[in-house]
């Protein structure tokens, strides 16, 4: 799963990011990767995003609201010093492990790189880091 944390409909860079991921959503899904975007917008703001996106039918992935910023903070897409949310993009495997992340003041928009890297990371075999005592 690819989780995108964005600041909301009022953030032009965020909207550019969502529009960058929209046409390649099917490519990610073909690789077994679903997308979801989490915003600080209210439910009304999310509905506005869908109608003003300029994309027929709205975005091809769910938009969720995190007004309390609990999820932003749990993923550390939050600057404690500045007391403000950050842009975040996370690749999460089937076991819930974060395999790749980008947290920044700018949204991540290199969809081609991320698709290729996601396929590489998710297709790696999972080997134990250290052998258990008495093994090997």
Where are these regions (language model features)?
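Chalcogenol-based redox active-site neighborhoods
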Residues: 1-136
């Amino acid at each position: 799963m690819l989780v995108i944390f964005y600041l909301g409909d009022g953030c032009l860079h965020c909207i550019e990011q969502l529009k960058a991921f929209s046409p390649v959503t099917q490519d990610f899904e073909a690789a077994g990767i679903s997308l979801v975007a989490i915003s600080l917008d209210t439910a009304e703001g999310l509905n506005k995003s869908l109608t003003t996106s300029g994309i027929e039918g709205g975005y091809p992935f769910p938009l969720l609201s995190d007004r309390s910023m609990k999820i932003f903070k749990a993923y550390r897409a939050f600057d404690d010093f500045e007391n403000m949310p950050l842009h975040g993009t996370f690749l999460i495997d089937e076991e819930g492990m974060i395999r790749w992340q980008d947290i920044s003041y700018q949204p991540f928009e290199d969809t081609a790189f991320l698709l290729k890297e996601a396929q590489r990371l998710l297709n790696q075999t999972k080997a134990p880091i250290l052998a258990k005592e008495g093994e090997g």
